């Protein structure tokens, strides 16, 4: 059968053949991730992405999400983070320890320095150090008694105010009527040289890979088309993954930003049990990160905690099948409510740098499919520095 011109790539390869091979590589990488062979999974994704033809065949977004999870878990292994919850494909929730191999020590020399390196995507997500969020805009503007203490204090106050304003705008974000400026045109997509993602800060590398997955999932917007239900669902799932990585890296405000973005996408979907569960999960994760953001006033934390508590209680009356998980979440949120109320009376006793507990990390069992967080029923104590 003679192939049509549009079915043949510039190098003479069948477009269909390349697509089939890419799907096979995705499945292999997913299996490696499930086996906790993080370096092998990451290299499989890197080599697949670098080998794709550059003339119009777009990568499967899942190559980027698997790559991101593998790189993230390599960093967890490198840092000896005993409290880090891995983002795994096919995690059965058993909580069994991985037989970690020394595979996370990557040699940069193995890949070599390639010619023709393309620029890293111009992702806006890294602006959030100054553009992070808070839950409300109507916040008292500080108790600064030492006016003129120095430019550092003034800059810090400006950043806090920008954070408050940014989150106030984001709390009601909906992609149905607002442009998502984190989803850039695919022309910004990296084309080759993916070995760089084994270097430097692997947390940020994982986030950048997820940002590229967003470019691919959101690409219909460049043609003025509406995103499909499935695309919005998968974009929401990518934002959850971003939030989980940021939360584990103690970038709590950035995590809240992306959990709220996920909520914005989930709330545009048609009502369904899966959607309801994702909304519940995202609401809980906002609270899980929020407890560590000191810039948010206690009254606004209480609003969010009580909102999540009411959602959980309502959900538990109609969905008893996962009541054990929801009970654990409910107990944690009630603890948060009690702590905020106690702090209002007696002042905070929590060290500023304590990271969060982790209930609800997602696991990919199929392309950005259902999240499996049943392994997180035991509430862990935050690690201390």
UniProtKB/Swiss-Prot annotation:
InterPro entries reported in the protein's UniProt record: TPR-like_helical_dom_sf (IPR011990)
Positions bearing Phosphoserine: 174
Keyword Metal-binding: no
Chain residue ranges for the region called Disordered: 85-163, 340-385
Result of changing residue 288 to A: Strongly reduces affinity for dimeric histone H2A and H2B
Domain of life: Eukaryota
Subunit organization: Homodimer. The homodimer interacts with a histone tetramer containing H3 and H4; the interaction is direct. The homodimer interacts with heterodimeric histone H2A and H2B; the interaction is direct. Component of the nuclear histone acetyltransferase B (HAT-B) complex composed of at least HAT1, HAT2 and HIF1. Does not interact with HAT1 in the absence of HAT2. Interacts with histones H3 and H4 in a HAT1/HAT2 dependent manner.
Domain statement: The N-terminal TPR repeat region contains an acidic patch that is important for interaction with histones. A C-terminal, highly polar region mediates interaction with dimeric histone H2A and H2B, but is not involved in interaction with heterotetrameric histone H3 and H4.
Function per UniProt: Histone H3 and H4 specific chaperone component of the nuclear histone acetyltransferase B (HAT-B) complex. Involved in chromatin assembly and telomere silencing.
Record-given protein name: HAT1-interacting factor 1
Organism the protein comes from: Saccharomyces cerevisiae (strain ATCC 204508 / S288c) (Baker's yeast)
């Amino acid at each position: 059968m003679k192939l049509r011109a549009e079915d043949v790539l510039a190098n003479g390869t069948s477009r269909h053949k390349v697509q089939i091979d890419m799907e096979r590589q995705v499945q292999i990488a997913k299996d490696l991730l499930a086996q906790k062979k993080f370096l092998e999974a990451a290299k499989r994704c890197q080599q697949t992405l670098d080998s794709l033809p550059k003339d119009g065949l777009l990568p499967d977004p899942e190559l980027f999400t698997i790559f991101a999870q593998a790189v993230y878990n390599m960093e967890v292994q490198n840092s000896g983070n005993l409290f880090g919850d891995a983002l795994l494909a096919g995690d059965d929730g058993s909580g069994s320890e991985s037989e970690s191999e020394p595979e996370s020590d990557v040699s940069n020399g193995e890949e070599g320095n390639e010619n023709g390196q393309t620029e890293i995507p111009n992702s806006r997500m890294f602006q959030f150090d100054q553009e992070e969020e808070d839950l409300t805009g109507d916040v008292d503007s500080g108790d600064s008694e030492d006016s003129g203490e120095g430019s550092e204090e003034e800059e810090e106050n400006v950043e806090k105010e920008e954070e408050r304003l940014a989150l106030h705008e984001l709390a009601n974000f909906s992609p149905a009527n607002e442009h998502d400026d984190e989803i850039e045109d695919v022309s910004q997509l990296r084309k080759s040289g993916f070995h760089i993602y084994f270097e430097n800060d692997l947390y940020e590398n994982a986030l950048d890979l997820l940002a590229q997955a967003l470019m691919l999932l959101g690409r219909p917007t460049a043609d003025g088309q509406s995103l499909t239900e499935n695309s919005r669902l998968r974009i929401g799932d990518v934002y959850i993954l971003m939030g989980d990585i940021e939360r584990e890296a103690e970038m709590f405000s950035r995590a809240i930003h992306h959990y709220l973005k996920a909520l914005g996408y989930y709330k545009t979907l048609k009502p369904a049990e899966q959607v309801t569960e994702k909304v519940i999960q995202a609401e809980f994760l906002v609270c899980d990160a929020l407890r560590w953001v000191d810039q948010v006033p206690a009254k606004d934390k209480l609003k969010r905690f009580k909102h999540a508590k009411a959602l959980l209680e309502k959900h538990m009356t109609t969905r008893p099948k996962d009541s054990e998980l929801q009970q654990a979440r409910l107990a944690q949120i009630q603890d948060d409510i009690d702590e905020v109320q106690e702090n209002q009376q007696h002042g905070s006793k929590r060290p500023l740098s304590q990271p969060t507990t982790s209930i609800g990390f997602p696991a990919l069992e199929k392309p950005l499919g259902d999240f499996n967080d049943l392994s997180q029923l035991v509430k862990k104590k935050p690690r201390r520095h």
